[in-house]
């Protein structure tokens, strides 16, 4: 009987998020044009350690998403771990699940703690799309004559479907056609995303989640403390922008997520561990689900992941206070709103990637962090974050504010 009670208590022990921070998001070739993904991640990793005053040697595992690893050096997550002062005995895993990488890292950490293979996990994501290199695939054999092929690592490994070589935006166009989303529909969604992010910036709603980054300039240093992209956007020009992927299409740069740089980190542990340390959890992880389908329909994979999560937890849209669904394209989030009947007033309330930017290895962790602080600011309790990814998949996580 005692053994049964012990097993039940172990199985029911909740996993909690005790610290969460992100960098500001930098525009492509913007404020972080000379800052590597490892450097960005190190800043927020040190920040979350300081947030709860934990000894970094006590962290068992560092799990960090990163998609564009070429040129970063061996084992980027391990580099962050060592640079952030974690023990040499701390394990490190670099996760590549394309745009879901940052969230998948957290889910791996969650499951490791539940399995008893780790007590405290640092998880998150990082990306410098600006510093992703060009690749010369035939250089090893030698370019003997004529012009040689040079491949954009960012496009080829981050933004391009390997099965037919179409860019992700091609499939956004197909999604818009399927759902009947007009150019105006998508423009209005994107404009609202920008306006929401600007309001959040001006009212200080991002302040608690952002860790400023000090960058070197030619003559001095400067501190970056807010997302770069929203203030650069000229809303008046959005309706006249050219289609980005099809000359007769409806998807533009404005209704697509911006190429960006940034990082996000969280610390998770069991509720018992947090209590023993006197730490107040930011959020409880209630569950997570994955959904996979045809690669060309990654745009609607969030719908399946969220629906599965609703059913797993016996939740529904009326029981969830806020949603964060990554705005890879406006139509991705609009499709989820349509099929799941989610009110836009409870979705991406501080704007999304169409306004803020989408550093692909970090964004999924970023939306979870934004969700946590948005729930707290609005006195909400339950939230779901979901991110789709190339290959036709999506992951979703449910949290509850204690």
Task: Locate predicted features.
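Active-site-proximal alpha-helical scaffold in enzymes
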Residues: 97-127, 176-205, 265-272, 337, ...
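Conserved active-site "lid/cap" helical segment
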Residues: 11-72, 76-84, 91, 171-183, ...
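N-terminal extracellular/periplasmic Venus flytrap/periplasmic-binding protein-like
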Residues: 22-23, 34, 38-43, 51, ...
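Flexible glycine-/small-residue-enriched beta->alpha junction loops
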Residues: 120-175
